[in-house]
Amino acid sequence: PDLPRHKGISILILDTREAGFSHTVIPTCSNPTAATYYDNVKVPADMLVGKLNGGWQLVTSQLNHERLGLGAWSDKVVGLFRRVFLWARARDENGRCAIDAPWVRSQLAECYARLEAMRLINFRIAADLEQGRMDVALASSTKVYGSESAIEILRKLSEIVGASGLVRAGSAAALLLGELEYEVRASVTLTFGGGTNEIQRGLIAQFGLGMPRAA
């Protein structure tokens, strides 16, 4: 109680078979997650991770790595972009291509530009990690830009393919085996995983721009 905030936290590994531990599944529009409960659970001291009272450093390090991973999600939509691009170039029964429309070319070009920008950011991050560096502001910036870019790219791809892109997998009418529809739903969770994008903008201001913390 006498330590400053965040300084008295320790991380322990818990065997989920221990008495008192339970969990419930929480379905979401993306992958399911879970809530965990600890009712008088006792954990042996030798299950300590790292140093005693050194847990907050582990938590923040994990969060930064999680943000980098979430920001890199835009790489996951590269495959969908390429498939939509090929679909747009293919001719229908009337000999027409979706890519003939100027607005489709414009949308595809913006998607490509965002993906290339994110790819360069990911290369920068990979180089930093190889050198043992972790920039808090860059991790948060990557998460914000990457997650919001993924949502925007998927939205544009959905506009290009039309109503068929909104049909779930398993239906004969599903375009691209329903992958685009699923990723559109799943991408929403990127904005709050690892800390909401609003929180990330505060971290960018604090650690990247040297601005004071919000009251």
Kindly give the residue locations of the regions a language model identified.
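FAD-binding core of flavoproteins
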Residues: 1-89, 93, 206, 211-215
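Alpha-helical interface subdomain recognition
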Residues: 64-215
